[in-house]
Regions:
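Phosphate-handling catalytic cores of nucleic-acid transaction enzymes
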Residues: 2-470
Length: 470
């Protein structure tokens, strides 16, 4: 076997690389602790209990409680920003966690009162259906069909959401401990992702949403609310967050994302049950009080939430935070300017949710709630910055790392496709795979192609060859 540089070119085109080599994977810096004590005591106390009993990551617990609170509060109140705009109190939360991080257990505990509410509504629906069936046919045909009772939806399309909100409850939650099903499902396929993102963005904004029905035209949905909390594994979540179409559309700027440190390997057995503690009883009672209603619904089945105002000290704090964030958009928050541009609105939304969790009859956002919202928003902006340049871990990166390790250990300046196909890692010896991976390595300035015929292998000039950065 011979590997030599021909003298076709007097000066090889390989002097000087265009840039510093880029890592195949960017390692995440450690996550900051979730500020659990920024939540109202009725939530924070239960959050600490869930964390202690389930030993799940802290932000997984915090996000679950915050999402659950938003779902309970959103039918009742909007919040008026100091400049006059009135916005919903819906929150969109995304938790990133590996398999086995107790996502389902945490979700079940946070949403237990919501599941009981949904079960109660389902029972009412069944009773109404049976009563309707007992009516004389002529009278039954004049009676409205009982509405659907779905309150918690796991992976619907926007079309499915519109149908649920039209035929059922005017406020629902998209909550899933297996959010990868939603992120990778039909609603987020290449053809449907933009439509799904646009629809979810409109729901977050509180704007009317078009509902197109085959056969009977179109209508608009007014007065509907959607809260969202998706838990997903890193590969699915980070690939979704790297989608350039969705980045440009603006959905991500409406999402509060956390990727906490794993607790795997530290979870020794503990016999305590979170749902049998006084903190659980207090949390369930407060959520049940909020969910019980009655919801402010008009004759058109549209929500008519009252408006919480931000005044006095809370207003001054909001304005101060607004100005600080706005100035930072040109500096340290430049990489997350989408979320940063909505951070002041999110401050108001979170503060309103926390206010109602403390006092369901409140009419003004409290300064304590605004202080807590500031702490929480700082956490989410920090998480967004931490995740802003992270590449999703996927098989292509793993395989590229495998090939790069072989090239580095081989220690030769030039390599050809036939040599890699013959002697490279056994898993990577198909020409198509090798070309794809060498492109990845080239994009990271670890290799670069050389002109046809410049390198010989086994006595033949090769068309496909690369220089290796050693």
């Amino acid at each position: 076997m011979t590997l030599s540089l021909t003298n076709v070119l007097e000066t090889p085109p390989t002097d000087g690389w265009p840039d510093e080599a880029l890592p195949l994977r960017v390692e995440l810096p450690p996550a900051e602790p979730f500020p659990m004590d920024a939540l109202p005591a009725v939530m924070a106390d239960y959050g600490h209990v869930i964390q202690r009993c389930s030993q799940a990551p802290d932000a997984l617990v915090g996000n679950s409680l915050l999402g659950a609170a938003s779902l309970a509060v959103q039918p009742y109140v909007n919040v008026q920003l100091p400049h006059g705009a009135i916005v919903p109190t819906s929150l969109y939360v995304i938790s990133v966690a590996e398999s086995g991080e107790r996502k389902s257990a945490v979700d079940r505990l946070a949403l237990h009162p919501h599941a009981m509410f949904e079960k109660s509504k389902s029972g009412e629906q069944r009773e109404a259906i049976e009563e309707r069936k007992r009516l004389p046919k002529a009278e039954m045909e004049k009676t409205e069909v009982p509405r659907e009772a779905v309150f918690l939806a796991s992976d619907p399309t926007v079309e499915g959401l519109c149908k649920l909100l039209y035929n059922g409850l005017p406020s629902i939650g998209v909550f899933s401990a297996e959010g990868g099903r939603f992120l990778g499902g039909y609603g987020m396929s290449d053809d449907a992702s933009l439509r799904t993102a646009a629809g979810l963005s409109l729901f977050w904004d509180g704007a009317p949403v078009d509902r197109v029905r085959a056969g009977d035209g179109a209508s608009k949905l007014y007065g509907r609310r959607v809260a969202l909390h998706l838990m997903a594994q890193p590969r699915a979540a980070l690939q979704w967050l790297q989608n350039p179409i969705l980045k440009d559309q603006g959905l991500f700027s409406r999402c509060l994302i956390a990727y906490p440190q794993s607790t795997a390997g530290t979870r020794l057995f503990r016999p305590e049950r979170a749902d049998e503690t006084p903190a659980a009883a207090n949390y369930v009672a407060r959520m049940a009080e909020l969910l019980a209603g009655p919801w402010p619904i008009d004759e058109f089945h549209e929500l008519k939430p009252r408006t919480l105002r931000i005044v006095d000290e809370a207003r001054e704090l909001w304005i101060d935070q607004h100005n600080q964030i706005e100035q930072a958009i040109a500096g340290e928050l430049r990489e997350v300017r989408g979320l940063a541009s909505k951070a002041a609105e999110y401050l108001a939304r979170i503060a309103a949710v926390l206010t109602l969790m403390n006092d369901p009859a409140a009419t003004l956002v409290t300064v304590d709630a605004m202080k807590s919202a500031t702490i929480l928003m700082e956490f989410y902006l920090g998480e967004a910055l931490r995740l802003s340049n992270v590449q999703p871990k996927h098989e292509q990166a793993d395989l590229a790392m495998m090939l790069w390790t072989w090239l580095a250990q081989r220690g030769k300046r030039y390599v050809t496709l036939p040599e890699m196909a013959q002697f490279g890692p056994a898993k990577l010896r198909k020409a198509q795979t090798l070309r794809m991976l060498m492109n990845v390595l080239s994009e990271h300035y670890l290799v670069r192609p050389v002109p046809d015929g410049m390198v010989e292998y086994n006595g033949k000039k090769r068309r496909e060859a690369w220089e290796v950065r050693l």
